[in-house]
Amino acid sequence: MKNLCIIPARGGSKRIPRKNIIDFLGKPLISYSIENALNSGIFDEVVLSSDDEEIIEVALKYGAKAPFMRDKNLSDDYASSTAAVQNAIEILQSQNQIYDHVCCLYATAPLLNKNILKQAYEKFIQNESKFLFAATEFEYPIQRAFYLNENNQVYMFDEKHYKSRSQDLTKAYHDAGAFYFGTSKAWLEEDFIFKPHSSVFVLPRNLVCDIDTMQDLEFAKILYKANHESAF
C-alpha cells in the first residue's frame, strides 16, 4: 500500500494574512503538520499543494515536497480542499505516481501529533470505509439551538426540545478541520465526504481549534502549551 499526504496551503488568506506560515510559538504554523506527517511513518510522500512561492519555500525547508504549483483557479476563496486534493492526485498520476490512500492534512492543525495520525490511519484501514476524518462533539446540544431574525427576535430551530434534558438528546458532532483519509478512488469519485460511506476519528476538544482569526490563533497557542505541559 502506498500512502500520500497532501497539505493544501493557499496564499490568499484574508482574516489572518499569511496564515499558513505565520509564527506559531517560534515556527511557521504549517511546519507542525509537515513534521507530524513525516514523523508518523505512515506516508511514502508528504506533498504540498500551494499557489504561493513563499509557502512552498517554507514547506520544502521542513521536509515536504512541492512537485507542482497549484492553479490560481483552485486557490481563491471559493476553492474547496476536495478540489485541491483531486487536482493533486491527478497531477501525480500523470507523473506515474500512484497511491492507494491519500490523506488531506490541514496546514492549520498544530494541536495534532504523529500518534493521532497513526491511530486514525489504523482505524481507517480497519473500517474499510471510503473516508475517515477528524471530528469532535458539539459542546452544547444542537437541538436547542436558536437563530435571530431581522428584528433580533429569538426563534428556536425546533421548540419541541426546549425542555429536553441534555442527556436525553442525541450527541452531535462536527468536522474538526484537521485531517481526512480516503482511498484515491474515493477522492476522485466523490465530492462530499459527510455521508454514511465515511467514518470518523473523534478528537477531544483540547485538540481542536479552527484558526480563522487572531483570537483563534492565540487560543490555539494556549491549548498547545497546556496540552504539552499536561503530557509531562
Question: What are these regions, as identified by a protein language model?
Answer:
Residues K2-S49:
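N-terminal glycine-rich phosphate-binding loop and ensuing alpha1 helix
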Residues I42, Y62-A64, E150:
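Short, structured coil segments at secondary-structure junctions
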Residues I42-V47, K130, N206-L207:
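Short active-site oxyanion
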Residues S50, A107, L112, F181-T183, ...:
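A conserved hydrophobic position in a structured secondary element of the catalytic/binding core
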Residues E53-H101, L111-L112:
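Short phosphate-binding loop-to-helix
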Residues S81-A83, H101, P110-H197:
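Conserved core of the sugar-phosphate nucleotidyltransferase
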Residues C103-L105:
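Short aromatic-hydrophobic micro-motifs that form the base-stacking/packing surface
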Residues V200-V202, L207-F232:
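Hydrophobic helical membrane-anchoring modules
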